[in-house]
């Protein structure tokens, strides 16, 4: 398959999911309402009154779960919309079809991460403007954002491929493995909070002096290799075991 066809498949999956989920009016409204509520909380209870700006970073713990669900939705949609027969019989290899969905899900994930951290940064700057730079240590804030972003990007391919595999297994002869995959999803999604607990356990000043240990950097390539193996498993199931 040439590059132009792959771009078409990628663009199709990306735009379809964008219209079905990201561009819905209720998503925009909920996002605006949430930001306004958090801004109000920072204004009333911010910093010395108990609600430190750095606590907002813990909202990122939901992102690994959302990452999995993005890729799960991209593939499971073919069954829900009744288009699995059309999609799977397209004159392209199963690996190309799954790779296009993986890339579309990855782009959606990057979009979510950008919106999330952009929104949190606006809230942090607002809190600093209200309470002063001495009360809101922005250096620690940006350090925490960078650490969390590295962990999220490091584990994202693993969660994305696990989402595709789970969707494929759900409608295959291996459906009995579905509960096990959902357990793996729960454990993998909790990795960020587990790592944050380790990093902050001996940091009384929170994220200000936290740093990623070497073993996390070393684990990221291994996670990406494992993601490649999981994607290969999903391709095999879609090619030989899927029911439609």
Spans of features found by a protein language model:
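Hydrophobic alpha-helical transmembrane segments
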Residues: 1-61, 65-66, 73, 146-150, 168, 176-179, 217-221, ...
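Active-site alpha-helix of zinc metalloproteases
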Residues: 8, 96, 100
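Secretory targeting signals
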Residues: 37-67, 99-176
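Transmembrane helix boundary and interhelical loop/hinge segments in multi-pass membrane proteins
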Residues: 51-54, 70-88
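Short helix-to-coil transition segments within interhelical loops
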Residues: 88-94
């Amino acid at each position: 398959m040439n590059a132009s066809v792959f771009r078409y498949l990628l663009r199709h999956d990306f735009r379809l999911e964008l219209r079905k989920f990201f561009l819905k009016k209720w998503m925009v409204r909920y996002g605006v309402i949430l930001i306004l509520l958090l801004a109000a909380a920072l204004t009333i209870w911010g910093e010395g009154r108990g609600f430190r700006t750095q606590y907002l970073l813990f909202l990122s713990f939901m992102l690994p779960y959302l990452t999995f669900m993005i890729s799960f939705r991209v593939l499971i949609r073919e069954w829900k919309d009744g288009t699995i027969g059309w999609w799977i019989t397209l004159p392209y290899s199963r690996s190309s079809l799954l790779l296009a969905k993986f890339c579309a899900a990855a782009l959606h994930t990057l979009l979510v991460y950008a919106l999330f951290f952009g929104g949190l940064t606006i809230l942090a700057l607002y809190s600093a403007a209200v309470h002063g730079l001495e009360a809101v240590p922005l250096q620690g804030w940006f350090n925490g954002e960078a650490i969390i972003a590295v962990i999220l990007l490091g584990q994202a391919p693993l969660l994305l491929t696990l989402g595709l595999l789970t969707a494929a297994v759900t409608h295959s002869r291996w459906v009995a493995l579905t509960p096990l995959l959902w357990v793996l999803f729960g454990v993998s999604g909790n990795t960020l909070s587990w790592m944050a607990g380790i990093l902050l356990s001996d940091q009384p000043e929170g994220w200000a002096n936290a740093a990623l240990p070497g073993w996390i950097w070393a684990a990221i390539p291994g996670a990406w290799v494992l993601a490649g193996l999981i994607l290969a498993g999903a391709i095999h199931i879609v090619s030989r075991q899927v029911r439609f």
